[in-house]
């Protein structure tokens, strides 16, 4: 099999240190040394395209720049790279969201992927004018995505639901091909919505056995819907010529953190409503409690899987750390349990992309795990009649 590789765009700024912020941490908490200018982000996406990456994830939230506008500006900077645009269903109407994606798809064919983010932080949702509780946000996402899918299929849609109400909605130019939907969520409410609508189910970087259980869960729900999903994982990476060099870099990243910074970040993350965030915190809970987090190796929770990033960063909090061969081995391990797509990042994002692209990618190619033939996810079949983490 051949895996699909994506990179990540730090639209909140970049640094040689771990940049905090993200899920559960207030806007403005991230401290970066490099401005997230279009010129800087363009240097990252052009490099990702050179190394053969399929796409680049652009995050959403109060702590970063708007993903759709960023993607539109960067599309002219590349020729083939796709943009995995994170968006929150319900902050704008499904008709407008469907139209925005269709317009992007028409002007940059095959180069928009959509990452559905239901939202795990009630306080952040309220800042955007959204006062629904978590389970209700999943119910709304279910209705929302049903309308979007039907609009993309060329239907004229009237939908009067509990959360979505549109009348005689249609698109003048439905997209061809239809943008694939990426969807993550670890709570009981998330699974059925992902099974009905997602083309790719995303998980953060937990140990392989935990990831396998998630895959089995979502796969079984998809089979009940008559659908077959692909699976993706979100990880950071520290890859070097030797394992010792990689772990030394991990040590440098956490050496720059102090106890107060970690404590404040963890307090914010602990308030998160996200089940995925709770699972991320649990990965290094014991090490934080006994103070051993200052030793990089103490945060190795599975072979070459390091939980140090999650000390101060919300969301994806783990990294593959090791020699280029070791990182390639771990990618192969995840692929063997069913992971099709990988979304990577590192600090700083441009330099770490080069370490990965020049060190790991050639090994993956040699093993037949990665190549130019790796295609975008083909949208899974969707029942358009009838109808969040």
Can you describe what each PLM-predicted range is?
Residues 48, 52, 74, 104, ...:
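Conserved, mostly hydrophobic/aromatic
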Residues 2-22, 29, 128, 134-175, ...:
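An alpha-helical appendage that flanks or caps ligand/catalytic pockets
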Residues 56-67, 90-95, 207-213, 239, ...:
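Acidic-and-aromatic substrate-binding clefts and catalytic sites of carbohydrate-active enzymes
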Residues 31-47, 183-193, 320-335:
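Short, acidic/polar
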Residues 10-12, 61, 86-90, 117-121, ...:
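Active-site beta-loop-alpha junctions enriched in small/polar residues
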Residues 91-106:
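Glycine-rich anion/phosphate-binding loops
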Residues 1-80, 176-179, 385-387:
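N-terminal beta1-alpha1-beta2 module of alpha/beta enzyme domains
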Residues 3-9, 55-58, 82-87, 112-116, ...:
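Hydrophobic faces of well-ordered beta-strands that scaffold small-molecule active sites
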